[in-house]
Amino acid sequence: MAAPLEAQDQAPGEGEGLLIVKVEDSSWEQESAQHEDGRDSEACRQRFRQFCYGDVHGPHEAFSQLWELCCRWLRPELRTKEQILELLVLEQFLTVLPGEIQGWVREQHPGSGEEAVALVEDLQKQPVKAWRQDVPSEEAEPEAAGRGSQATGPPPTVGARRRPSVPQEQHSHSAQPPALLKEGRPGETTDTCFVSGVHGPVALGDIPFYFSREEWGTLDPAQRDLFWDIKRENSRNTTLGFGLKGQSEKSLLQEMVPVVPGQTGSDVTVSWSPEEAEAWESENRPRAALGPVVGARRGRPPTRRRQFRDLAAEKPHSCGQCGKRFRWGSDLARHQRTHTGEKPHKCPECDKSFRSSSDLVRHQGVHTGEKPFSCSECGKSFSRSAYLADHQRIHTGEKPFGCSDCGKSFSLRSYLLDHRRVHTGERPFGCGECDKSFKQRAHLIAHQSLHAKMAQPVG
């Protein structure tokens, strides 16, 4: 009986040993699975961010694919709302970091917002040269020194990285080198396409090629605009951390015909900071005549319309009477009529005059009876949208105008102005008969009716 008991006593130990091995094995498998999931999640994030509408057929398929990619990235079936929010905030946090800090932090692959913040704080404590300057290898330095002419453009940023020399095999098939040079860290993989008139692959991440002032002058305005559109769009996508894979972006780059004369495959390219790119763009981009241009998407270079709006923000037109400034001469002319009393716009129905044509148009609604603004709740119509907005507060109960003295709220601004006279004691409506004053016009009218009755003969 003792032997079986000893066997029973030893059995749990052996079982525990087996269990320990299984637990460790399971833990290793979980870590491996998490690593694979992390890589798959990052790939889905990049595919989600660079998804192109033109890659699918129709809006339904586009929305479905975006939904699937987003779910694969964020994994809502596994993560809580807080974890999903942290992923989104972490991505945006990395996006808004300065370029050099952003690149270094992305290389560390932070898994949480706290980790990313800690990396940035640690980086800021280090000497600037320790992380901003990328020291080339001993073999690459003399090779770079023996290359041809330097790239034309703004000076390189501190820590600008040089792409290693293009292997000779890439040039063996043709005497003409690629017009665009690769730029970035060694070992990066970038999508390539073929540019019209250029032999050999050209990386879509290689838009920072450069023009001298003479070469820039040979480009027509359309080519210059296309250059800046592609360059800025590529810069935005590079900042977000993914390449350009959409066919629409590839076809856009293929339209970039001009190749820099005299530029060879041995030219050295350097990266720009956003500030230097903006400065060089402002110097080299011509002050062309401002025409109608479609509004730009976020992240695209400023359009002529935006430039025109920026120039107008200076408000060069000043009123000689009160000193008020205006962006446009027409606004100044309209304003000056408040000083002169001029009313050039006359109503053909009643000969009433108005300072602006818009006031005349609103007045003519009185004669036509037109009331184009209808309330969806009760069907009541109004001649002005402002009247409709005031009326709709009856249904919603909204009272947006509050008194700063007592906190009472009102649905109309005029009601608030009448109420404030209770606090200020103002009585702007005076009677011409007895010099009595009133806070509201209605009270004055009621008072004047008393004078009218008293003036009537008693009969």
Curated annotation (Swiss-Prot):
Residues 202-292 form the KRAB domain. A zinc finger (C2H2-type) spans 317-339, 345-367, 373-395, 401-423, 429-451. Residues 128-188 are annotated as: Disordered. It comes from the Eukaryota. GO terms for cellular component: nucleus. Pfam families: KRAB (PF01352), SCAN (PF02023), zf-C2H2 (PF00096), zf-H2C2_2 (PF13465). The keyword Electron transport does not apply. Keywords: DNA-binding, Metal-binding, Nucleus, Repeat, Transcription, Transcription regulation, Zinc, Zinc-finger. Transmembrane segments: none annotated. Widely expressed with highest levels in testis. GO terms for molecular function: DNA-binding transcription factor activity, RNA polymerase II-specific; RNA polymerase II cis-regulatory region sequence-specific DNA binding; zinc ion binding. PANTHER family: ODD-SKIPPED - RELATED, ZINC FINGER PROTEIN 208-LIKE. Belongs to the krueppel C2H2-type zinc-finger protein family. This is Zinc finger protein 213. It comes from Homo sapiens (Human). The gene is ZNF213.
